[in-house]
A protein has these predicted regions:
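Bacterial N-terminal signal peptides that target proteins for export
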Residues: 2-14
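C-terminal motif of bacterial Sec signal peptides marking the signal peptidase cleavage site
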Residues: 22-25
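Bacterial signal peptide processing site
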Residues: 27-30
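Post-signal peptide N-terminal segment of mature Sec-exported envelope proteins
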Residues: 34-54
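Short amphipathic, basic-aromatic surface patches that mediate peripheral association
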Residues: 66-74
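Short coil-to-beta strand junction motifs in C2/discoidin
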Residues: 75-81, 151-154
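An anionic, turn-rich surface loop/hairpin at beta-sheet edges
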Residues: 96-129
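Internal, hydrophobic beta-strand segments that form the core of beta-sheet-rich folds
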Residues: 131-147, 151-161
Length: 164
């Protein structure tokens, strides 16, 4: 008769428990992100990036990020944007945003690879709660003097549900 060591018995017990704990520890983060590619990296003032996201939980707070990707050849340290948010069944709320992309001393903000830079900035400085559940529409347009504004690759919104 073959002897089964205590280690073999533990192996068959520990492995399934470890797998269950690993699977249970994986928590899905509620995230929405939509980025719109700017055609030919030339953002005309008439071109508006837009999209929509659904809010189901009105108790939790959400972080809303503006995501912008540009090349190293972009000639300004900032970009002025008109950001619109339309709650379900309500009118459009517009906000002008001066998004700082860098400065002359420290260079570009965000993450970069070769000559491409991505900046992700929290809008309004803190997470917010949505008053009503439903479909929210957003729009982003550039309001700089240059038309078209060159070397902007994409722009979008990222919405993350914060942990309570």
């Amino acid at each position: 008769m073959k002897k089964v060591s205590i280690y073999n018995k533990l192996h068959f017990l520990v492995l399934p428990i470890a797998c269950c704990l690993f699977i249970a520890s994986c928590k899905q983060i509620d995230v929405y992100e939509k980025n719109t590619v700017i055609p030919n990296y030339e953002w005309s003032s008439s071109f508006t990036a837009s999209g929509n996201f659904v809010i189901k939980d009105t108790v939790s707070a959400y972080s809303i990020y503006l995501v912008l990707r540009h090349t190293d050849a972009y000639k300004y340290n900032n970009i002025w944007l008109n950001i619109g948010l339309q709650p379900p069944g309500d009118s459009l709320i517009k906000q002008k945003v001066d998004l700082q992309l860098g400065d002359d001393v420290n260079g570009w903000e965000g993450t970069g690879m070769n000559d491409i830079w991505e900046v992700r900035k929290l809008l309004n400085g803190q997470p917010r709660r949505f008053k009503q559940a439903g479909n929210y529409n957003f729009s982003i347009s550039q309001i700089m003097r240059d038309n078209p504004l060159t070397n902007i690759m994409s722009v979008g919104i990222r919405v993350e549900k914060r942990n309570p």
